Amino acid sequence: MEKQNFELQKSLGYHFNIIFINIKKSMEIKLKDYNLTHLQFSILINLYKNNVTTQKELLKYTYGDETSITRLVDRLESKGYLKRVQSPEDKRKKMLLLTEEGVVLTEELITSAKKVNSEITANLSKEESTLLLELLQKIDISM
């Protein structure tokens, strides 16, 4: 039986995985100082930037499940970075809001994330970085 021709090191999946691991490691080093995980950072950034106000909305942005999101939100709330408040429109619904401490922390983390992004793209021109992002978004949409 003839072996199929496939070079792992030339596949997109291989490189996406290696890049993801390296980015995650870089961010985890920065997040370790704050005793946060990358998923907790994702929640904070989405509450800060995307006008997300409920745990259900967070599911769209974090690729988590309800149980894990609840646990992550509980931890962030216990650390004082966010709070649950009753929705003025629907008394059954709880809204998530960053506390003042959560806003300050998230802004510090955004600065750290920008540094990591700069490190990642240090060998690319501005045009290459823009093109790469556009191509990655195109791939993401098609999946």
Give a label for each model feature:
Residues K24, D74-E134:
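Charged, amphipathic alpha-helical coiled-coil/dimerization segments
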Residues M1-N5, K126-M143:
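C-terminal regulatory/oligomerization modules of transcriptional regulators
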